[in-house]
Amino acid sequence: MESGAVRTIDEAFRKYLGNGRIGDVKDEWASLPQIIAWIRDAGGTAVIAHPEKYQFTRTRLRELVEDFRAAGGEAIEVVSGRQAGPETRTLAALCQQNQLSASTGSDFHQPGQHWAELGRQPAVPDDCR
């Protein structure tokens, strides 16, 4: 933006960072067990962040959660940004079924964004741990 190549962050993403664009860098990912081990070795808690954003089928989401738990994952972000109540209930049920903890996040990335305010999100459902 400072160089004048784009006027906004949204324009930068549309112009340079989408699939097949110049900033689309293909890379290889570490395995799920390796990623979880790194997180835990660093003293962190392995959490699946905003799983409703991945647009998985229910079956694929369930498989991801089961694989995550089997690899040592500990929690699912049950509440994120402005998601709807049915999504929260689905994610809470997945937590319970897989004996995982629940987390919450506002999905805040930067000042001025329109989809989420810092610290402004619903509480985790009472039946989650």
Regions of interest found by a model, annotated:
Residues M1-E28, I35:
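Active-site-proximal loop/helix segment associated with metal-binding centers of metalloenzymes
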Residues S3-R7, Q34-I48, E52-R129:
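Charged catalytic cores and adjacent phosphate/nucleic-acid-binding surfaces used
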Residues G23-K26, A30, Q55-T59:
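A short glycine-/small-residue-rich loop at the edge of a beta-strand within enzyme catalytic domains
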